[in-house]
């Protein structure tokens, strides 16, 4: 005999607040970590400590084709989604931490970095500090490509 389905519990949506100390019209900061490689763009918003994730959207979540994941358009859509979620939770301003792949790979941010930053600024979020946090090696492991490098 199949179990009865009468005692289903309705899931309640938890409303996250930033505490009672936030006054109306006060600027509340979050940290937007933008990781822009040449394959994808991540827009990840946390609280100021960086421990609590508020929202994380990637370019691959916004477009269907794999080749478009790192495009400026996908990054713009991802940033708009993140900004909307931040506003609903009461975050009005963002510090930006921009990151490229780094290490022994490229230190140049991908094509989505600029458009993600612009989309955050245009969606009425105040921008605090902008910082480049690309990992730069003090001494690196050997880069791939062999002795004579990548031949085109």
Curated annotation (Swiss-Prot):
GO CC list: cytosolic small ribosomal subunit
Record field: compositional bias (Basic residues): 143-152
Q: Name one GO biological process term.
A: translation
An example of a Pfam family matching this protein is Ribosomal_S11
Sorted alphabetically, the keyword list is:
Ribonucleoprotein, Ribosomal protein
Which SUPFAM superfamilies does this one have?
Answer: Translational machinery components (SSF53137)
Annotated region Disordered: the residues are: 131-152
What PROSITE patterns does the annotation carry? RIBOSOMAL_S11
The terms under GO molecular function for this entry are: structural constituent of ribosome
Family from the record: Belongs to the universal ribosomal protein uS11 family.
The protein depicted here goes by the name Small ribosomal subunit protein uS11B
What organism, scientifically named, is this protein from? Answer: Anopheles gambiae
């Amino acid at each position: 005999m199949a179990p009865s389905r009468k005692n289903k519990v309705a899931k309640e949506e938890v409303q996250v607040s930033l505490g009672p100390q936030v006054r109306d019209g006060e600027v509340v900061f979050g940290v937007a970590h933008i990781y822009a490689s040449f394959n994808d763009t991540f827009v990840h918003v946390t609280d100021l400590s960086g421990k609590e994730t508020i929202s994380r959207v990637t370019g691959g979540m916004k477009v269907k084709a794999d080749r478009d994941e790192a495009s400026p358009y996908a990054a713009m859509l991802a940033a708009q989604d993140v900004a909307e979620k931040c506003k609903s939770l009461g975050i009005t301003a963002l510090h930006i931490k921009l990151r490229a792949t780094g290490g022994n790979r490229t230190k140049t941010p991908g094509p989505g970095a600029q458009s993600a930053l612009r989309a955050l600024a245009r969606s009425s979020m105040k921008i605090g500090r902008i910082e480049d946090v690309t990992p730069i090696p003090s001494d690196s492991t050997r880069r791939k490509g062999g002795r004579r490098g990548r031949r085109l």
